[in-house]
């Protein structure tokens, strides 16, 4: 009886994990939140969208847009940007908070930002020299990782 209960619990756990594992759905750019569409028009006007998708998690929805240049932008449910990753180019200057841009130009003048992420705790910035800088929400540098 005990083995049967364990087996039933394992089957249930496996079933629920596979149900929520892959909830990605391709979408058109027009299905993105208006704020995200405006962000793309403003900061990536010459980029062509390769594809866009909506990712549903248990309690959250995010959007991802990948351009033909391999640059990528992730958006939150409300259309705010979460991550900008410009693999083969630099992140548009208007996206980078002024305090972070000033720090990078002062201490790393020969580099540029290729990726920036933000969440509820911090900003993470990746430079062309491979360094990753982490800032708190008040733009104080809190970590440097190579």
Locate predicted features.
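Bacterial Sec-dependent N-terminal signal peptides
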Residues: 1-24, 40
């Amino acid at each position: 009886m005990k083995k049967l209960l364990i087996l039933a619990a394992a089957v249930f756990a496996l079933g629920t994990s596979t149900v929520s594992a892959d909830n990605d759905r391709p979408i058109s750019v027009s299905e993105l939140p208006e704020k995200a569409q405006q962000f793309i028009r403003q900061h990536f006007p010459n980029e062509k969208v390769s594809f866009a998708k909506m990712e549903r998690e248990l309690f959250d929805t995010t959007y991802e847009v990948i351009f033909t240049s391999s640059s990528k932008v992730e958006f939150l449910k409300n259309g705010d940007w979460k991550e900008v990753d410009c693999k083969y180019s630099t992140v548009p200057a208007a996206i980078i908070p002024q305090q972070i841009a000033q720090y990078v130009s002062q201490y790393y003048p020969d580099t540029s930002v290729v990726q920036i992420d933000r969440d509820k705790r911090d900003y993470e910035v990746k430079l062309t020299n491979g360094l990753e800088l982490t800032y708190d929400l008040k733009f104080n540098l809190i970590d440097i990782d190579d």
